[in-house]
Amino acid sequence: MSDKLGDIDLVISHHPRGKALAGLDDVMDLQIDMLEHYGVPVNIAEKLLKKRIKEVSRGLSPGNHQRAVDMARLLDVPLMSIHTPCDNLVAKFVEEKLEKDNPRILKEVLESLREIPEYREAEKVGVGPKLFVGGKKNRTGKIVMSEITGGTEGAPEIYQKLADAGAGTVIGMHISEKHRKEAQKAHINVVIAGHMSSDSIGVNLLMDKLKEGVEIVPCSGFIRNKRN
C-alpha cells in the first residue's frame, strides 16, 4: 500500500489496535452511564457490566495486539486508532435522526435509517439495516441506542432491565445470537443498522472536521460520505 499509493501521511484504523485493543475493556464503563441515562438503575447496570467487563478482559488477553502496529512501524507509516469517539458520534447522529423522524413501527425505523447514505450503500451489498427481533408492523415503543458505543457488546442480562425501564426497541451495529435471544425473551425489538456502515458514519463525521485540503483514501470497508 505504501509503495502503490505513495504520500500516505497517516493510516487511521477505526477498530483499536495495539495497546488500545488490549485495553478495550477500559471503555466499557461508558455503558453503565448510558444504561442509567435510559432508566436502568445504576447499581444494577454496574453489577451486570462489571461481570461482562472482566469476561472481555480475559478474552482479550491472548491476542496478538501488536501485529498491525509492528507492520506500520516496519513500513514507516504512522498509524492511529479512533474507536469510541467515532462510535459516540454515530450514536448521537442516529438518535437525533430517529427523534426527528419519530417512527412508530419498525418498518418506519428501517426506512429512516435507509435515508442515511452509508446505510443506503451498505444495502446495495446486502448488509443494510435489518430486523433481528420483531416484525415490520411491530410498534417501536421507546427507542434506545444501547448497542452502538461502549467498546463491545455488554451483558446479555441487560435486555430485561432495559425492558423494565420502558425500552421497546434497541438499535445496534451488531449482536451475538446469545444477546439476540435474551432480547427476544425480554420482548425487546432489535434493529441492527449495520457494523461497517455505522462505523463509517462515525468516522465520516470526524473526517468532515478535518481542514480543507486533507485527502482521504477510503479502504477496508470504509464508506466515505462527505456532509459539508
Regions found by a protein language model. Give the residues of each.
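Active-site catalytic microenvironments in core metabolic enzymes, especially phosphate/sugar-handling
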Residues: M1-N228
